[in-house]
């Protein structure tokens, strides 16, 4: 029986693909070496310890239907589109060695005619006339008896969109957590015009087989049926949940301020695990009562635009004469935390 396993996903859903990755990683025999190839439609993928409100322009992502996905490994935020090829290498210990998987990717690039080299802890770079340019970034995860190395290769990604989504709004946000370090990047199509996802996958697969001296048939993961993987439904539900993608953010504070025709408002939020643990409201409004009531209602509320709107609009029952002010406040708050 072969010790290798090759899986290729036809899904572009980041939550689906990360759930597949997690299920395989949890249930694989310690003697197995796995290669999983995949790609995602428009998504910002953040590291396990990152704060999406700090790392991303969450409002623009929502407007453009860009998903947020938190992975189980560390590292920084990256933008995925169909111009990225994603790879995951898994192995039990002591077989797991990220230098082996890195060399497999370098060999694959070399076979395609691209001379690249490892740089720093987790990047692959190519030399250009403008200097070194990153074409691949990776992250890693290890448990007691196994580990994985996953990463992306930039084929023909829309690099302009990185800046759109990976630069957060200039919010007054004091946040803990890992901050991404931006690198200068380039696409492989600059070096190999016309290179495709399928060609890159084939090159990585051949380098994987060559390293281990074995070949196996690829298992195709279809988006049209639930994968036959233990606990997939539960894993997918968690991976796609707001509680995991947003609620796992490290504790942070958020200061919002705005001036309306009826007065200025300053909101101070402390947020832990996606819930507001403390809310303070300051205002020079001539009628501060609804705002004082709002501060009490927001304590314990999910830090989510629709929930903030719901709590604000619930005050219309008690303060019908301030309907205009409350609706303006509700719309502003929702926009500010997206």
Curated annotation (Swiss-Prot):
Q: How does it assemble?
A: Monomer.
Its name, as the record gives it, is Lipoate-protein ligase A
Q: Which residues does the UniProt record annotate as the domain BPL/LPL catalytic?
A: 29-216
Record's catalysed reaction(s)? L-lysyl-[lipoyl-carrier protein] + (R)-lipoate + ATP = N(6)-[(R)-lipoyl]-L-lysyl-[lipoyl-carrier protein] + AMP + diphosphate + H(+)
User: Which pH dependence is annotated?
Assistant: Most active from pH 5.5 to 8.0. Inactive below pH 4.3.
Q: Which UniProt keywords apply?
A: ATP-binding, Cytoplasm, Ligase, Nucleotide-binding
State the EC number(s).
Answer: 6.3.1.20
> Top EC class per UniProt?
ligase
Which organism does this sequence originate in?
Escherichia coli (strain K12)
């Amino acid at each position: 029986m072969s010790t290798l396993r090759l899986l290729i996903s036809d899904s572009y859903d980041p939550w689906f693909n990360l759930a597949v990755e997690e299920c395989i990683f949890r249930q694989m025999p310690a003697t197995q070496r796995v290669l999983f190839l995949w790609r995602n439609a428009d998504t910002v993928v953040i590291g396990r310890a990152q704060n999406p409100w700090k790392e991303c322009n969450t409002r623009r992502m929502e407007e453009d239907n860009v998903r947020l996905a938190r992975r189980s490994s560390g590292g920084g935020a990256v933008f995925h589109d169909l111009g990225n090829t994603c790879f995951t290498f898994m192995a039990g210990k002591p077989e797991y060695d990220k230098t082996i998987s890195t060399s497999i990717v370098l060999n694959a690039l070399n076979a395609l005619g691209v001379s690249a080299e490892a740089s720093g802890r987790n990047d692959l770079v190519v030399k250009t006339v403008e200097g070194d340019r990153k074409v691949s970034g990776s992250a890693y995860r290890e448990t007691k008896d196994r580990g994985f190395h996953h990463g992306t290769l930039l084929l023909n990604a829309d690099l302009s969109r990185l800046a759109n989504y990976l630069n957060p709004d200039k919010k007054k946000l004091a946040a803990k957590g890992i901050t991404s370090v931006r690198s200068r990047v380039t696409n492989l199509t600059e070096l190999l015009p016309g290179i495709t996802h399928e060609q890159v996958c084939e090159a990585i697969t051949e380098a994987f087989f060559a390293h281990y001296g074995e070949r196996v048939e690829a298992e195709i993961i279809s988006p049209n049926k639930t994968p036959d993987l233990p606990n997939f439904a539960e894993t997918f539900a968690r991976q796609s949940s707001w509680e995991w993608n947003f609620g796992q953010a490290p504790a942070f504070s958020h200061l919002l301020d705005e001036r309306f025709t009826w007065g200025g408002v300053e909101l101070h939020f402390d947020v832990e695990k996606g819930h507001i643990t403390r809310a303070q409201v300051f205002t020079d409004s001539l009628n501060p009562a609804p705002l004082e009531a709002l501060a009490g209602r927001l304590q314990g509320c999910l830090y989510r635009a629709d929930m903030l709107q719901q709590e604000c609009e619930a005050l219309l029952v008690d303060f019908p004469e301030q309907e205009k002010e409350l609706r303006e406040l509700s719309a502003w708050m929702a926009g500010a935390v997206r």
